[in-house]
Each structure stands twice: as C-alpha cells, then as structure tokens.
Design a protein with these regions (language model features):
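Mature catalytic core of soluble alpha/beta enzymes
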Residues: 1-257
Length: 257
C-alpha cells in the first residue's frame, strides 16, 4: 500500500492507495504523478479560498477589493453551492460568518477531497482513501481480504480513545466529523441553539454531503439532527457534552464487527 501525507488547509492530508507501492527501492510512477497533482490542487484551493491568506481571492472579496459579481466563476459557483446547502438545512449550515463575511471553508475542504478521489480514479486506481483532518472518502477495499475501509471515530474528550469504528463501503464511502476535536471551535451556533452536541459524525454517499450535514448538526442541534435523519439517507452519530452517544439505525448497520 502506498501512503502519502502532507500538510495543507491547517491540517494533515493522508492518502492511502492499496493498488500501489511506494518505497525507497520500489516506486510507482503513476502513483507519484497523481499524488503530486493532488498536492497541487489542494494548494491551489487553499490559496484561493483561505481567509487566513491576504492574497487569496476570498480575502479580496471580504475586504471589498472586488465584488462578488466580479469574482471568478469558480468562486461564484462554490458560493452558490453553499447557499443551496443553507437552503437544504434551513440555515443550520451557512457560508457566512456572524459578521457577514463570506467563508467557504465549510465546503472547500470537502471539494478538495472529492477532487482528489476523482484524480485517483482517473489515474486508474480503484482501492484508496483520502483523509483530511479526520474527514475522508474511500473507494474499493482496504485489503484483498477486507470489504470496504474500516475507520475509527475519536472521543472528543480523549483523542487517544476511539468510541466507534465503522466500515465504509461502495454505498456509503464518505465520512465527516464536525466539532472541536481536529481543528478547534470553528462552527457558529444559531443564536437560539444550545450546544446540544460537541461532535457529530455523518456517513454519506459523498464527502460534501457528509461534511456539510455534520457541520449543520453541530450548528443547529437536536432539531437539525432530527430534520437531517428524516430527509437524508445518511448515517449519523453524535456526542453530547455529557458524553451521551446517539446513533441512527443506518449508522449502527455500518459499525465494524
């Protein structure tokens, strides 16, 4: 298995390709080429959408140096996508900070993961995982004698403890966890929402859906959780401040045995 890691977007990216081998004496030129392309795309998206960079396009929009109407077509399309998710979640997910600044970090990381998976598929790889700060998408199998990919979910109160392990498969290959474990507090609660959950994990058919809905659950609390489990075919597990776990039936079906 080829394993490649690098830092970007304030977190760690880990790519595992079960179809390839990388080492000091054996190399896979196809894997090396696509991994370089993936790093480049992550860097490009970070340079374009990071509000921590003064030279990013999104920062220029935030400062008013350019209007949204004059921004690149790609940025406007990503903003439109985020607005669609705000509509689908009744506002629990939003591309706006409390001060009104457009912040697309809630979708861009997932966009980068999705792009990496497409690049790997286009390069001919079938069995791989792309993990970015605990959010991941998978394809195929982890090993010849394994079905799907097994991944753990950490305890938000003790990062050295795994509270559950699930098997991602062809129907539900993507998983995202929101809360304060991997990257600190970064989600804005609705004014009327108490902090019902300190962590939410969503498993879905694609990483963008998983990431957005996990964020929405943290932001919107129990009411949003109920809405999502009724309206979306996703697996969900939440952790309350007192450590109580909630998992819907679909999540329980994916728990690794």
């Amino acid at each position: 298995m080829a394993i490649h890691s690098f830092e970007t977007m304030g977190t760690m990216v880990s790519i595992r390709i079960a179809d390839a081998e990388l080492g000091e004496h054996t190399t896979d030129d196809r894997a090396i080429a696509v991994l370089n392309e993936i790093e480049h795309e992550f860097a490009r998206l970070n340079e374009k959408y990071s509000l921590y960079r003064d030279d990013s396009e999104i920062s220029a929009v935030a400062r008013g140096d350019i209007s949204l109407a004059d921004a690149s077509e790609e940025l406007r399309e990503e903003y439109a996508r985020a607005l669609e998710w705000r509509e689908k979640t009744d506002g629990a997910f939003t591309p706006h900070r409390p001060d009104g600044i457009i912040d697309l970090s809630g979708t861009i990381k997932a966009v980068a993961i999705e792009s990496a998976a497409k690049q790997l598929t286009d390069a001919g790889f079938v069995n791989f995982s792309v993990n970015v700060g605990g959010d991941l998408t998978t394809s195929g199998n982890q090993a010849a004698d394994e079905s799907g990919w097994i991944t753990g979910i950490v305890d938000p109160q003790d990062r050295g403890t795994v509270i559950s392990a699930v098997r991602l498969n062809a129907e539900f290959p993507a998983m995202a966890t929101s809360g304060s474990v991997e990257r600190g507090e970064h989600i804005w609660l609705r004014p009327e929402t108490t902090k019902d959950f300190v962590q939410a994990t969503v498993i879905a058919q694609d990483i963008i859906t998983a990431d957005v809905l996990a964020t929405a659950i943290i932001s919107g609390g129990q009411a949003t959780l109920d809405q999502i489990t009724q309206n979306f075919a996703v697996a969900v597990m939440t952790v309350s401040p007192d450590g109580t776990l909630q998992a819907n039936p679909l999540f329980q079906e994916l728990v690794a045995q």
